[in-house]
Amino acid sequence: MIPVSLVVVVVGGWTVVYLTDLVLKSSVYFKHSYEDWLENNGLSISPFHIRWQTAVFNRAFYSWGRRKARMLYQWFNFGMVFGVIAMFSSFFLLGKTLMQTLAQMMADSPSSYSSSSSSSSSSSSSSSSSSSSSSSLHNEQVLQVVVPGINLPVNQLTYFFTAVLISGVVHEIGHGIAAIREQVRFNGFGIFLFIIYPGAFVDLFTTHLQLISPVQQLRIFCAGIWHNFVLALLGILALVLLPVILLPFYYTGVGVLITEVAEDSPAIGPRGLFVGDLVTHLQDCPVTNVQDWNECLDTIAYEPQIGYCISASTLQQLSFPVRAYKRLDGSTECCNNHSLTDVCFSYRNNFNKRLHTCLPARKAVEATQVCRTNKDCKKSSSSSFCIIPSLETHTRLIKVKHPPQIDMLYVGHPLHLHYTVSITSFIPRFNFLSIDLPVVVETFVKYLISLSGALAIVNAVPCFALDGQWILNSFLDATLTSVIGDNDVKDLIGFFILLGGSVLLAANVTLGLWMVTAR
């Protein structure tokens, strides 16, 4: 559910803004001066919407649009080709997304894991950035509805809205420069806030826009999504090169650094994980970076519980008579004292008979090699057994190595460890450096990639009121005018394509919202 406090703040804030605006406009003393102030500053206020427009940046836009004319011509030609391809590809992408959503709705147990754009999704900002790289732990769709407070953590709103605003500004800069390049008058640039979503816009002289050729219009209309696509590519490049960029201050490849442990995490405790710990192994799985951490947890979660070699003498010394019984899930329990330190283990004796024994977990698994069967233990000692923790179906005992501290023994679902422990691959070279800085940068870049890419895809959809509508109209004018002489037929074709795109997008948004809010 959306946090009530967030709703109260948003609704309360807009109520104050709107009532203040209404009172000032109704006041005999302040009406004219207030309206003059709004007009002079390019401000307009309506319910849940604030809009600011300025001509301050016009000179900069004209400078950019008239510089290196030949290069810009080729640049926006590439953008035009990309825009047309993206417009038609969006049908396939939306159709695929709709099928995925319907498949999830039909499933008995829809996947409970979702991301941002790219996202990415977890309980804290740093865990989101570090864990979103694991595709195996998530059944992600290319497009997904994002609702703050539901599948977008409230503590990541700053990343989200900053990335939305930057993506919107870059999008509109593309339209503005392309328009000036095609000799369309540029009136101004602006920013708006709708409820909680920020955005940008450019004001172009409509008459000029209608007088230029369809191909010129295409360059202008495609420029926005083209710039968003390029921004997403630059974000991917920055993400790949981040270890190199931060190399003078941070190093990687030796493990993962703990940046945060949630208060409700099972990893909290005197012998648990702490901020600043360097994890090098999960069981016998080496961890050198975030991807290794995710893959190791994935393997541990979906493979049978691993065992530990123990000598016959140690087993005899530590074990004591117990009465085993079956749990509801069919697994066996043999520790009847509900101890936090003892765990029920199963093993096969020399006669291949399965036995159960209750052992102090730390003494049983410390300084031992891992195994699957007794044969794995015979290599080191002929009188050894492979003892395997007898736990509930989805529960695992995981030995987490974080030297120089003593190994942490974690008992629980691997995904709980995944979602309640925040990590980073970047280890500071100097003590004064923040361990959170690389995580903040990484998280923001991932949001920028996801949201800029999403803005390019969604705006390319031939849908009423989106860039795709104008791209489609210009494309039909450029290609069908000489083929179909009757403009009414051409307009009818365009209308049905727009109707199909609008219905497809609306279906995705509606079902996506239902899937997000119904979970």
UniProtKB/Swiss-Prot annotation:
It catalyses: Cleaves several transcription factors that are type-2 transmembrane proteins within membrane-spanning domains. Known substrates include sterol regulatory element-binding protein (SREBP) -1, SREBP-2 and forms of the transcriptional activator ATF6. SREBP-2 is cleaved at the site 477-DRSRILL-|-CVLTFLCLSFNPLTSLLQWGGA-505. The residues Asn-Pro, 11 residues distal to the site of cleavage in the membrane-spanning domain, are important for cleavage by S2P endopeptidase. Replacement of either of these residues does not prevent cleavage, but there is no cleavage if both of these residues are replaced. It is a multi-pass membrane protein. Expressed in heart, brain, placenta, lung, liver, muscle, kidney and pancreas. Residues 115-135 are annotated as: Disordered. Its main location: membrane. It is found in: Membrane; Cytoplasm; Golgi apparatus membrane. Its cofactor is Zn(2+). Coiled coil: none annotated. InterPro entries: MBTPS2 (IPR001193), PDZ_sf (IPR036034), Peptidase_M50 (IPR008915). It comes from the Eukaryota. One of its GO terms (cellular component) is Golgi membrane. One of its GO terms (biological process) is ATF6-mediated unfolded protein response. Zinc metalloprotease that mediates intramembrane proteolysis of proteins such as ATF6, ATF6B, SREBF1/SREBP1 and SREBF2/SREBP2. Catalyzes the second step in the proteolytic activation of the sterol regulatory element-binding proteins (SREBPs) SREBF1/SREBP1 and SREBF2/SREBP2: cleaves SREBPs within the first transmembrane segment, thereby releasing the N-terminal segment with a portion of the transmembrane segment attached. Mature N-terminal SREBP fragments shuttle to the nucleus and activate gene transcription. It is linked to IFAP syndrome 1, with or without Bresheck syndrome: An X-linked syndrome characterized by a peculiar triad of follicular ichthyosis, total or subtotal atrichia, and photophobia of varying degree. Histopathologically, the epidermal granular layer is generally well-preserved or thickened at the infundibulum. Hair follicles are poorly developed and tend to be surrounded by an inflammatory infiltrate. A subgroup of patients is described with lamellar rather than follicular ichthyosis. This is Membrane-bound transcription factor site-2 protease. The gene is MBTPS2.
